[in-house]
Amino acid sequence: MDQLAHHYRAHIAELNRRVAEILSREALSGLVIHSGQPHRMFLDDINYPFKANPHFKAWLPVLDNPNCWLVVNGRDKPQLIFYRPVDFWHKVSDVPDMFWTEYFDIKLLTKADKVAEFLPTDIANWAYLGEHLDVAEVLGFTSRNPDAVMSYLHYHRTTKTEYELECMRRANQIAVQGHLAAKNAFYNGASEFEIQQHYLSAVGQSENEVPYGNIIALNQNAAILHYTALEHQSPAKRLSFLIDAGASYFGYASDITRTYAFEKNRFDELITAMNKAQLELIDMMRPGVRYPDLHLATHAKVAQMLLDFDLATGDVQGLIDQGITSAFFPHGLGHMLGLQVHDVGGFSHDERGTHIAAPEAHPFLRCTRILAPNQVLTMEPGLYIIDTLLNELKQDSRGQQINWQTVDELRPFGGIRIEDNVIVHQDRNENMTRELGLTD
């Protein structure tokens, strides 16, 4: 924790600098950042799992306590209004006592509806950042999630501080242990549901604590991009395993994917080819490179794999131009990663939030930025046998370029995705996932 404490001072200084800058531009007195409120299920007395506002947890690792507030102006010591009710029904959060508390003036709030007593008196000139606009209106905020402030903060969130990078390394380190446990469970005959339990136990986090719903897909289920069903029974024949799963550390996410074949076969060879391509793409990352160019390079590699593995005929550029590669690789190469799995700022050209759209032929690409130092991105090329997409090729002449016999052979395996989390440095790339132990 000493290293985090060392980096945290500079982290808070940078956040204060950003706040002071945007407040000066927008002639605002400060920001009031709301952690959020519980959401109750319809016609029930149970709340949905609480997820803190990412703008709130950017400042401090208070992740599970609703009704907290931050009052910041970039000059004075930030004020944390920490919710600690008198409650004999539920576990009440302890008063914070960690390395970060010295950087905040902490006030305890015992009743959520009394927060106005702790807020600035000239509230009309402060901006509210949060989800609950109705609460903000009642409290008197006239500026609620102003576009200029949000665009500025989102643009700069893509540049991680050293504190944030260390948190993300630790999130990767934790997730790697889960992936190794899940891989072992797969080869020992576990079902999807059982593999999930092995993963969660290894990372020491519940389903509500990991940053997103894990994808644990055996066999043809791997062709479903966001598969989260978790079958309880093991398949009669074990062919393949795709796992897309991360972990959290102090509010920062990791997002890692691996694919395994149960036996040595053509699908296993395809995994090896995809792994090689993914590492080559990561080697292409450097400051000044356009992320969409990396995505297009991925399609060239996928096209070559289609040719090499007798899935399609033709030439590389023709397979791309006709949209054939998009039927096998329909999603984007990756995205920004940080406080959110699909972190903000991936389309921001500048501090004003000028939007750079994804290429028309690749609408699912989640990042169009030019790479810069201290950005963290996922790199996750894939190749899948998705019948709904491949059937579209059958409707025209493109279907004649597909070797449907090979498609039929690979269909039971579902698909492949390999995903690492990479820090772009000025002079190198840091592949956190591989360097922390998930080498295959």
Swiss-Prot record:
Its cofactor is Mn(2+). Binds 2 manganese ions per subunit. It catalyses: Xaa-L-Pro dipeptide + H2O = an L-alpha-amino acid + L-proline. Its EC number is 3.4.13.9. GO terms for molecular function: aminopeptidase activity; metal ion binding; metalloexopeptidase activity; phosphoric triester hydrolase activity; proline dipeptidase activity. It comes from the Bacteria. HAMAP family: X_Pro_dipeptid (MF_01279). Belongs to the peptidase M24B family. Bacterial-type prolidase subfamily. Splits dipeptides with a prolyl residue in the C-terminal position. This is Xaa-Pro dipeptidase. The lineage of its organism: Bacteria, Pseudomonadati, Pseudomonadota, Gammaproteobacteria, Alteromonadales.
